[in-house]
UniProtKB/Swiss-Prot annotation:
Function: Transforming growth factor beta-1 proprotein: Precursor of the Latency-associated peptide (LAP) and Transforming growth factor beta-1 (TGF-beta-1) chains, which constitute the regulatory and active subunit of TGF-beta-1, respectively.
Record PANTHER family: TGF-BETA FAMILY, TRANSFORMING GROWTH FACTOR BETA-1 PROPROTEIN
GO molecular function terms listed in the Swiss-Prot or TrEMBL record: cytokine activity; growth factor activity; type I transforming growth factor beta receptor binding; type II transforming growth factor beta receptor binding; type III transforming growth factor beta receptor binding
CDD domains: TGF_beta_TGFB1
Name of this protein: Transforming growth factor beta-1 proprotein
Motif (Cell attachment site): 244-246
Gene Ontology cellular component list: blood microparticle; cell surface; cytoplasm; extracellular matrix; extracellular space; nucleus
Organism: Bos taurus
GO terms classed as biological process: ATP biosynthetic process; cell-cell junction organization; cellular response to transforming growth factor beta stimulus; chondrocyte differentiation; epithelial to mesenchymal transition; extracellular matrix assembly; extrinsic apoptotic signaling pathway; hematopoietic progenitor cell differentiation
Length: 390
């Protein structure tokens, strides 16, 4: 009787022959990084941010809300915060690489403000100081399915007439009925119509990541300390009633709207899948089925997600996180298998493959109270801008 090893030889020969025919075939997407549930990753990221903020401020626990004075922030503190935020945004814009998709044409869409007669406006107190503009986010998502596809967004208003010079300010509505300052404009007197435009790209991107059905802006007269009259003198088309027939139709078509410029989804997917991945750090995820290391968008609302009311500005921010496999080639004609075995022997608990980690991070300016004293601080490395395999 032949030895047992010889009896197994006929069974091993077909397997050896198959391996010889495919010596250089890669193991597709091979990675020892564990598959992670998306919701679990988000929850862990939120909890990590909770500890990160407290640690950076050297706080053992969130500050008490009992001593915080009611009312808006002091004007000097708000001005300091706005200038810090603008400086950070300016530095980010200088280092932002031009995406490949910017070379191609953008689809332009107009989303009209919800008509002024809608019951949504009944929730806002009538005021001679401000006007309100609300938008249906389902129409926004229909025009721009993914936040990363948005190239630019402007809110445009048709000013009909203005008898005196006036300083106006634009605010963004938050879910807790507070308002965040965005921009301002000094308007000169004029009897002829003129379109006013405000860049609200960041705000609309934020709306696209949230689940609110209605979002809005407020246009207000600047509240000057030395002025007793804070009435909004600007006549904006779309905010008066009583018009009939064709005049009402024209009036409604020219009401405030969002002008959106975005890369069509099918074009973005084509560009994303066809270009070489030598620079993973510049890629944002275009869908939930992304198969490469990329930046996943995650918006943190301080009140909703962390239960915090002590951070006064901002109300939230895009923290983001990195996720996705980092595939490598494992060929039978290389010595990599020997190195891998040696690595696993000395590091049994570590990942044998590169993992998706943050590469570029941005700071986050905040306003919070210590007792009754407001403070402006800049927290370093809070926003994930790009990722890499490491």
């Amino acid at each position: 009787m032949p030895p047992s090893g010889l009896r197994l030889l006929p069974l091993l020969l077909p397997l050896l022959w198959l391996l010889m025919l495919t010596p250089g075939r890669p193991v597709a997407g091979l990675s020892t990084c564990k598959t992670i549930d998306m919701e679990l990753v988000k929850r862990k990221r939120i909890e990590a941010i909770r500890g990160q903020i407290l640690s950076k401020l050297r706080l053992a626990s969130p500050p008490s809300q009992g001593d915080v004075p009611p009312g808006p922030l002091p004007e000097a503190i708000l001005a300091l915060y706005n200038s810090t935020r603008d400086r950070v945004a300016g530095e980010s814009a200088e280092t932002e690489p031009e995406p490949e998709a910017d070379y191609y044409a953008k689809e332009v869409t107009r989303v009209l403000m919800v008509e002024y007669g809608n019951k949504i406006y009944d929730k806002m107190k009538s005021s001679s100081h401000s006007i309100y503009m609300f938008f249906n986010t389902s129409e926004l998502r229909e025009a721009v399915p993914e936040p990363v596809l948005l190239s630019r967004a402007d809110v445009r208003l048709l000013r009909l007439k203005l008898k005196v010079e006036q300083h106006v300010e634009l605010y963004q509505k938050y879910s807790n009925n507070s308002w965040r300052y965005l921009s301002n404009r000094l308007l000169a007197p004029s009897d002829s119509p003129e379109w006013l435009s405000f860049d609200v790209t960041g705000v609309v991107r934020q709306w696209l990541t949230r689940r609110e059905e209605i979002e809005g802006f407020r246009l207000s007269a600047h509240c000057s300390c030395d002025s007793k009259d804070n009435t909004l003198q600007v006549d904006i088309n779309g905010f008066s009633s009583g018009r009939r027939g064709d005049l009402a139709t024209i009036h409604g078509m020219n009401r405030p709207f969002l002008l959106l410029m975005a890369t069509p989804l099918e074009r973005a997917q084509h560009l994303h899948s066809s270009r070489h991945r030598r620079a993973l750090d510049t890629n944002y995820c275009f869908s939930s089925t992304e198969k490469n290391c990329c930046v996943r968008q995650l918006y943190i609302d301080f009140r909703k997600d962390l239960g915090w009311k002590w951070i006064h500005e901002p109300k939230g921010y895009h923290a983001n996180f990195c996720l996705g496999p980092c595939p490598y080639i494992w060929s039978l004609d290389t010595q990599y298998s020997k190195v891998l075995a040696l690595y696993n022997q000395h590091n049994p608990g570590a990942s044998a493959a590169p993992c998706c980690v943050p590469q570029a991070l941005e700071p986050l300016p905040i306003v919070y109270y210590v007792g009754r004293k407001p403070k402006v601080e800049q927290l370093s490395n809070m926003i994930v801008r790009s990722c890499k395999c490491s």
